Amino acid sequence: MKNKISIIIPVYNTEVYLENCIESLINQAYSNWEAILINDGSTDNSLSIIRNYEKQDSRIKSIDLKVNKGVAHARNTGLDVATGEFIYFLDSDDSLDQYALGLLISNITHHEVIFGSFNKQNKKANLTLPVKHRIKYSKSKFRNESVLNRLFRRTLVDELNLRFDEDYRYYSDLTFLLPLLDYFKTVPTITGYIYKKQWRKDPDSPESLTQHDDVAKIKEYVERFHKLTEVYSENPKAIKFLCNQFISYYCQYVIFVLQEQDIYSEVLEDLSSVVQFIDTHSYSRRISFFIKRELKAIRNKDEKKLRKLLKLHKVLRITSRSLKGRQKLYRTLYNYVFTKLPMQNKTIVFESFLGKNYSDSPKNIYEELINENKEYNYIWVFAKPGKDIPGNAKQVKRLSLAYFYYMARAKYWVSNSRIPKALKKREGNIYLQTWHGTPLKKLVFDMNDVHSANPNYKADFYEQSRRWDYLISANSYSSEIFQRAFKFNNRMFEYGYPRNDILHSDNKTQLMERFKTQLNIPLDKKVILYAPTWRDDEFYKPGQYKFSLRFDLERLQEELGDEYVVLLRTHYFIADHLNTEDFEGFAFNVSKYDDISELYLIADILITDYSSVFFDYANLKRPILFFTYDLEKYRDTLRGFYIDMESELPGPLVFTNDEIIDSIKNIDQVKEQYQAKYDQFYDRFCGWEHGDASKKISGEVFS
């Protein structure tokens, strides 16, 4: 086949993003390509990921360099073995829109090179094929000095002997691109976003090729600038281009580095040498009044003046950005005002399920602290403040100004779900992640494919979990999985879940009567709790999942209504409302009931599917039925399970409403049939639960 594209991908410690990158190639509408992945001495699992895909797809080829030699060497190595008529460069932490390669190859026609447009990872390209009128022509050949997202003819690369200068670790792209300046007058560009750039700012995550030691990068940039201006001294176009590129580099990178780091003495001399050169040559890039003054201060090596100008520039930029929306204003205040205030060492912020509930382990830890009379300033985050809770905690609305203020000032964060990525931890901040269940479904880096509404699920999760100082585990099974699937290496509290303390309390009978009365459930009726999970592939948008009730309430009421009532409890991700109006007195929708642990306590039978609720409920040693009507799809396509559903569960799998009714009518026989398996299950998953997890964690974290 003609028009084969060789995609060259250097790889260095990007296991977090690599699968997403490779999957974006496999999913391309255009199939005539080869991917050459050069493992540049990675110390993580990148090489094994590459080798695994290489076995599955003959278009994927790997090269292992053993020792890290830098991106320039890796790309040159890829060029040496590429067999395609076209060359394309991709970073291993980035990904492509489904139609990216097809758009490039179908529109390059008689041209030697074609450019694509970049996009940040969280935006959608919304492109479809065939595409007409998606090409524009530009005289500005290189708006940035990156080889990424450019499709080159191999004949052009060979004719001009285009290679990357391996003397440069960070800024080698321009040595490949500069020879093209005089080669053509205009460059075609795809107008739609086709390349998804992964911008990462987490200092603990693997670094992309554009994020490293700032002093070394600036010094290398200056060195390369002077070398190239010398090489192209007789080429006015090249000199003008290099001058324009430096100004862009200053505006997009150097300014921010100098504003955040005190490295003036290390780089001012170098920067001044470039500005002095630019002052004697022409450039076409428009620059603002502030930039002109800053460059003048750099030229004159006036550090004091430069500091003042950059400080003023930062204030104006922040003010301008803040005026563009309330949330942007709040995030700006968080980053530049609130986190600069003294940390409140006796303040704890609690949040459960994105502020939807007063529940779960954060609730139990909070109540343990107030029972112990520990003198802290307690803040509870709710989507709708005004809940009736014990103690004197201040309630704040999630994502409000007060929320950002207290998140910035509190020493302690306690949450069972994820806190927004925009909230960067400050030094000294302690984040206790309680988590929300023993895992049945595969998690994060144990998942081969992600079918959720968020295509960046793994990368987002990794960045957010780097903030966790402590993580709670309910059993050794969970500890092993969390360490691997979350890549978590900090302290794990292995005491069981605080939320399950109530299931081991001495006054369970009194509590059951109280909770039944609160829900208007007759004390003489037995309770069936149905608690299903969401389906990853059925959603309206990220965080809002569809759910279709397969539970035949009418039949259940007819067959079991004299003895039982049913509580329906959907996962907090599920957006659909369950209507139980026709079953008043029999079916109760308790999806918005704050604390599911209290529902466990009053439930005589649990019916679930792939929700992890049964791990907690098993503490009570009461019967569990598993309504798994779509088992094959969920097990084999969506997530996959950590345990064998057919052999390890402490109760039967049922697939129809007939089986549910029959099992409930014969629940004593079911319990007897599964007793041995239940005992084994209890020992494995509930053995750490003794009703004192909250007390132990209180003593360890808040001593």
Where are the language model's segments positioned?
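Active-site and donor-binding regions of nucleotide-sugar-utilizing enzymes
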Residues: 347-505
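Nucleotide-sugar donor-binding/catalytic module of glycosyltransferases
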Residues: 1-219, 528, 616, 697
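C-terminal alpha-helical cap of glycosyltransferases
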Residues: 690-703
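Conserved catalytic-core segment of nucleotide-activated headgroup transferases in glycan assembly
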Residues: 357-373, 485, 498-580, 654
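Catalytic binding pocket for nucleotide-activated donors in carbohydrate/polymer assembly enzymes
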Residues: 585, 612-685
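A donor-sugar binding/catalytic signature common to diverse glycosyltransferases
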Residues: 413-442, 593-638
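C-terminal subregions of glycosyltransferases and related glycan-biosynthesis enzymes
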Residues: 197-335, 371-374, 687-688
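Donor nucleotide-activated moiety binding/catalytic core segment of transferases
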Residues: 396-412, 418, 572-615, 648
